[in-house]
Amino acid sequence: HPDPNPIWARELMDAMMADGAPDLGAASDGDGDRNMILGPGTYVTPSDSLAVLAANAHLCPGYSGGLTGVARSMPTSRAVDRVAEKLGIAAYETPTGWKFFGNLLDAGRATLCGEESAGTGSDHVREKDGLWAVLMWLDILAATGKSVPQIMADHWAEYGRDFYSRHDYEGIESDIAAGLMDDLRAKLGDLPGTEVAGRRVAAADEFAYDDPVDGSRAEGQGVRVTFHGGGRAVFRLSGTGTSGATLRVYLEDYTDDPARFGDDPQVALADMIAAADALAGIAERTGRTAPDVRT
C-alpha cells in the first residue's frame, strides 16, 4: 500500500502491540520512500518520528556535526519546531509536496525534512528515503540503549507532546466540499479572539509560502486555525473530480503535563475535533458524523 500507517499495516500493528513484540517494527511502501515506526506497544507518528530524529541526529555518525536546519510540511505537527528552537537552528514550514523541500536541501538550509504522510529524508538524497529513516532509528536505539517507548517518553519529558491525528472525509460531493472551504475562508478574518468549542482562537489564515531560495510563492495551501494553548486545526481539499472530493482535517494539540503524555490521541484531541466541526460545519454539510479514515 502506498501509505504505511496503522490502518493498512494492521498485521504489523497487531504484532507490535502484542506481548513479546520485538524492539522495533517498521513498514514502508512499495518503493521504500515512506516509512512507519513502531516499538513494543508504541506507534510513533510521522510527526514525532521527524522530531525524534532531529533531536538525536548527533548520535548518528553522518550527523555528528549537527544539523543546519529542519523542514516540515505545514500540516505536519510542530513537534520538530520545538526541537529546532532548542538546537538554535532554522525550522521551515512548507506546503505539502516533497518538491518544496528540494530547494532547502540543495541550498544547505535544511538537513532533515519530513511530512505527516510518512515521508522522511535528509540531505544525503533529494528524495524521501524510508529505509534511511528506519536505519537512523536503529542507530539511535543502539547509541542510547533505550527502547522506542523510553525514547518517546524521554522526548516528551523534554519537549512536551504534540497529540496529532488526520481525519479524512472521502467522496464528498465536490460542490459541497468547495462551499465548505469557501465559507471557512470567508470568516478567517473574524476568528482571532473568538471562542470555538471552548477554545480561544489565536490566529487564522490560508497558508502561503515564499520560497527563501528562489523567491517563488505558493498560495492557497490550506486553511489553518491555531488556538491558545497549542491547539491547531488545518483543512485541505483534494481530488475534486467526478468521484467527489476528500476533505483532510489535521488536528493537533500540545501539552507539557507529564500526567497526560499517555493519553489516547483521539481523547486528547476531543477539543480540536469539536472545534474543527464547529468551524467548518462538517457534520451539518456532509452528513458525516465520523471520518472515513483516521490516522
Predicted regions and their residues:
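Phosphate-binding chemistry for phosphorylated carbohydrates and sugar-nucleotides
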Residues: 1-161, 249
